[in-house]
Amino acid sequence: MAILTLGWVSLLVVFTWSIAMVVWGRNGL
């Protein structure tokens, strides 16, 4: 169960980071 939770957390972090990169890229940062 811990591995499954870790997988979901890591997936969420990667997804959030990707969205942040796109937003910052559009803002010219």
Swiss-Prot record:
Main location: membrane
Family label: Belongs to the PetN family.
Any single Pfam family the record assigns to this protein: PetN
Organism field: Nostoc sp. (strain PCC 7120 / SAG 25.82 / UTEX 2576)
Protein name (record): Cytochrome b6-f complex subunit 8
NCBIfam families xrefs: PRK14747.1
Keyword entries, A-Z: Electron transport, Membrane, Photosynthesis, Thylakoid, Transmembrane, Transmembrane helix, Transport
Topology in the lipid bilayer: Single-pass membrane protein
Transmembrane segments: 3-23
Gene: petN
GO cellular component, one term: cytochrome b6f complex
Function field: Component of the cytochrome b6-f complex, which mediates electron transfer between photosystem II (PSII) and photosystem I (PSI), cyclic electron flow around PSI, and state transitions.
